[in-house]
């Protein structure tokens, strides 16, 4: 979903649906690979947790070797599809994300609560894959859409980790809520990051990615999530944490839907303009990096040699 939003917001007025479809397929393959590597490495810990004990690996319904082989095949397929149909930058982002998720985020989970920040980085990459598939560059717009996803994951996951703090403890995972019995630090983190979502989302309007309607909706949604986080800070109960979690689930699809519906011309400050006029002409089609060179006004390109 987030890859598609990043691509649509960055796309020309005439969305290249074939490029979008291949980008979604390649990103899905990469994401599935990362998830499989994660479950392979955590299969023994997953068996100790009520939430994950029924997964195929802990239940031994499938062996580690075929899972490893399929994960490798999906990682390669995702990389190949994205290189072929989207470009080197989205392919590098997606494949790098698989490596970070499997080789950094997963091993950090039993060691430090900072693993959540690394996981949030991984969650921020898919919309950047979509963006770069359409633009061919990691310009400011890519960082804005990625930044929104990064910040959103923090209150979302803190609420989830609070609800399953005992389960995470049984699995030996070092999550902040599992090491914060009072919940005070967890609640403060949720409130701070929820409030940060308001200016973070407004950057999309300032960069020309979306319009005033989006800015208004983003502000209201951010304040709603912040209010629920404040309620959790005042009464640190599972019921309040569940409300934050549910509101965060509502927040993201609504925000992304409004961003797509109210997408605006990308600001020149973002480094590329995708839905308006570039150097005096309309843009439609592949990224500028793959486009034929523009001729100055009044001139025509020389005829090709026979």
Region roles according to the model:
Residues 128-138, 197-204, 251-268:
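Hydrophobic alpha-helical transmembrane segments in multi-pass integral membrane proteins
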Residues 1, 8-43, 80, 88, ...:
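Membrane-embedded alpha-helical segments that form the functional core of polytopic membrane enzymes
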Residues 31-58, 155, 165:
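Acidic (Asp/Glu-rich) catalytic motifs at the cytosolic membrane interface
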Residues 182-185, 226-254:
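Interfacial loop-to-transmembrane junctions
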Residues 29-36, 99-107, 147-165, 198, ...:
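Transmembrane alpha-helical segments that form the membrane-embedded catalytic/substrate-channel core
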Residues 43, 50-91, 181-205:
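Multi-pass membrane catalytic core of lipid/isoprenoid biosynthesis enzymes
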């Amino acid at each position: 979903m987030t890859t598609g939003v990043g691509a649509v917001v960055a796309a020309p007025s005439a969305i290249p649906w074939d490029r979008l479809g291949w980008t979604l397929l390649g990103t899905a393959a990469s994401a599935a690979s990362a998830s499989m590597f994660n479950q392979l490495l955590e299969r023994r810990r997953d068996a100790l947790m009520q939430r994950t004990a029924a997964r195929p690996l802990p239940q031994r319904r499938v062996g580690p070797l075929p899972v490893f082989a399929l994960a490798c095949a999906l990682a390669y397929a995702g990389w190949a599809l994205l290189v072929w149909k989207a470009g080197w930058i989205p392919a590098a982002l997606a494949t790098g994300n698989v490596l970070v998720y499997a080789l950094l985020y997963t091993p950090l989970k039993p060691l430090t609560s900072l693993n959540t920040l690394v996981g949030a980085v991984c969650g921020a990459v898919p919309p950047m894959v979509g963006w770069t598939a359409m633009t061919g560059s990691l310009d400011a717009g890519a960082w804005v859409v990625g930044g929104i996803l990064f910040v959103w994951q923090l209150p979302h996951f803190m609420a989830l980790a609070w609800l399953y703090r005992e389960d995470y403890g049984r699995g030996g995972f070092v999550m902040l809520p599992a090491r914060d019995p009072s919940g005070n630090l967890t609640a403060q983190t949720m409130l701070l990051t929820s409030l940060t979502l308001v200016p973070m989302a407004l950057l999309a309007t300032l960069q020309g990615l979306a319009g005033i309607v989006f800015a208004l909706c983003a502000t209201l949604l951010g304040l709603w999530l912040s209010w629920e986080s404040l309620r959790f800070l005042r009464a640190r109960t599972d019921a309040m944490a569940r409300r934050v979690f549910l509101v965060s689930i509502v927040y993201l699809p609504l925000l992304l839907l409004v961003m797509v519906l109210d997408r605006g011309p990308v600001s020149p400050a973002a480094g590329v303009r995708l839905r308006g006029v570039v150097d005096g002409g309309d843009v439609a089609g592949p990224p500028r990096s793959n486009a034929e060179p523009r001729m100055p006004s009044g001139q025509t390109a020389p005829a090709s040699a026979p």
